[in-house]
Amino acid sequence: MWNMGLLFLIYYCVSIYSAKGDTKDGQVLPLDVGALAEDAGDAEANGEDTPERNSESSVLDTTLAFEPQASTQSTPIHGAVPTWRPKRDNCTPPAIEQFPQPLMNKWARQHGGLILHILVAVFTFFGLAIVCDEYFVASLDRLCEELKLSPDVAGATFMAAGSSAPELATVVIGVFFAKDDIGISGVIGSAVFNIMFVISVCALCSGTVCQLNWWPLVRDCFFYCVSILVMLIIIFNDVISCFESVVMLLCYVGYCVALHFNTELERWALGLNLPFKLPSKEEQSALVTYKNVPEGSYTQESVGQTQGQKATDDSETRSAKPQSDYQDYSDPNPTWDPNAAWGDESQPNPVANPPPVDDWGMGHSGQENMGYHADQPESVVTGDGPPAAVKSGGQVVSTQATSAGGNDYYKSTDKQREPRRDPLLRPMEGGLPALVSWYVVYPIHFLCKKTMPDCRQEQYRNWYPFTFLMSMVWISFYSYFMVWMITVIGSTLAIPDTVMGLTFVAAGVSVPDALSSIAVIKEGFGDMAVSNAIGSNVFDILVCLGLPWFIQTAIIKPGSHVNVISKGLAYSTLSLFSTVVFLILSTHLNGWKLDKRLGIILMVWYLFFITLASLYELNVFGYMNPPECPSTY
């Protein structure tokens, strides 16, 4: 320990001497003070090529794992700021050393022990999905109701945090524990996973063709592009400051404000002369948000044949209007009964119409809206915003309007038509696969049930603050073990952390979003599934990255900055623009419908993007990611 302290003192003195020698050029380079010991790669990057520095570099390379206490002394060098993590040009500090030492050494892991780490990582994926879906989202649902937030703001803040909690926890662990790029790469990979893989699986799993509305898709993609641009500008110089993290958070505040005025923006957009097929009023209703038909019966000819065959005079009048007349479509229509549109007559309405026939000549009878229940009128929300949140298991929080005279704040939908089945009870149906899956997730359900009250149940509805806190603890627990196991796997297989983040971590943290979108697409909610997948990406980039960076640079170590080690992440972020353009272009060329053909196209593009991004991180196209430094773990 005494020898290491002496080496650091020698290194510090040489650094000051070298920096003073550079003043003859009229420029003083910043010196990183008070963080970790830096090696010869930093000296070369700063132009410090003195003989004394070169003689010390070979000795200092042996102290890469040395982590001294942060110095409180100031330095006379102008512009010096403490860094959170040293950047090295010769090698990347091993992230595995930031975690407890594994029980198995590297030789044991390479000869079969790695399978245990893989199983633990998969188990953490299940844990994150169950905790987020069953408890965390439910507590946020009740929290939004108690705060009486507007539906759009609730959906863009708390409910978005529900499905994106694993991404946020992963970035926090990557910044404060692993101290590497696994959090950033996980967010980038999760963004591609949501916008390509999840939507592709939704299209492949759906047995119907869902006609998509262009406005929610274009709106979400626009803000998604803005968030990508902000992220690209911020990480392009490989450092993140406090000001830049604040900019990211303010951008998300602007996104919430835009969602609050979604009605005005939508009216303005629909008043434009755009070459898109506008949906009917039923399609824009809070309850009828999609059009779906059996996949084999969708043809362009059938569209033309059924345009003039409307079930009511009102729909005939709408079909004859020009596009510019649709700008007032969202005004309340008291003569249209949403219950009648679904074939539900359990609620009386003085002006009830028969179930309308859609553009494909098919009625809506027998189809269930997941955000509305006839026996629970209080669960319906008003507001003209996009879907606030989607929860797997047949539960959706809709944030669109039913009438102008209703409540304009968020309402919980935690009451269900059918009682929930106790997950601790052994399944009687499904055979061996259901029994095996029950045994696998039984420990997760058991621990959650014993430590957190289910605030969806009537007797625990007021316990949502405790459920919220405990679910955050469990999410942090599973996320920590997930990042730990992924780091061990990558270190054992000599795979960079950024590649593991783009692939395995991205898939693991996106499980809640994937389950939500797949659940609603099976019910025919194409717009809702796509909006859930794209909208969560805005939260992932602006909040899941901006908030941990702000805490680190403004609260924990004011004046410091966070370093981005891999240069390939900037190229991966730039490539995210291609995913947005490809999604909109392919959807438009496919007639704004979600079918199996679009699903296959998106799946191929996802595999291509992940392969290209991984090759960047593996230095196939140039020196982007320094190799990992030797480690004794």
Swiss-Prot record:
Belongs to the Ca(2+):cation antiporter (CaCA) (TC 2.A.19) family. SLC24A subfamily. May function in the removal and maintenance of calcium homeostasis. Transports one Ca(2+) and 1 K(+) in exchange for 4 Na(+). It comes from Drosophila melanogaster. GO terms for biological process: calcium ion transmembrane transport; calcium ion transport; intracellular calcium ion homeostasis; sodium ion transport. Residues 411-422 have a biased composition (Basic and acidic residues). It holds the Pfam family Na_Ca_ex. Disulfide bonds: none annotated. Residues 133-157, 203-220, 449-468, 522-535, 590-597 are cytoplasmic. It is a multi-pass membrane protein. Residues 298-310, 320-333, 395-405 have a biased composition (Polar residues). One of its GO terms (cellular component) is plasma membrane. Keywords: Antiport, Calcium, Calcium transport, Ion transport, Membrane, Potassium, Potassium transport, Repeat, Signal, Sodium, Sodium transport, Symport, Transmembrane, Transmembrane helix, Transport. Residues 1-21 form the signal peptide. InterPro entries: K/Na/Ca-exchanger, NaCa_Exmemb, NCX_ion-bd_dom_sf. It is found in: Membrane. Residues 22-111, 179-181, 263-427, 490-500, 557-568, 619-633 are extracellular. The lineage of its organism: Eukaryota, Metazoa, Ecdysozoa, Arthropoda, Hexapoda. PANTHER family: SODIUM/POTASSIUM/CALCIUM EXCHANGER, SODIUM_POTASSIUM_CALCIUM EXCHANGER CG1090-RELATED. One of its GO terms (molecular function) is calcium channel activity. This is Probable sodium/potassium/calcium exchanger CG1090. The chain crosses the membrane at residues 112-132, 158-178, 182-202, 221-241, 242-262, 428-448, 469-489, 501-521, 536-556, 569-589, 598-618. Residues 298-422 are annotated as: Disordered. Alpha- repeats lie at residues 153-193, 506-537.
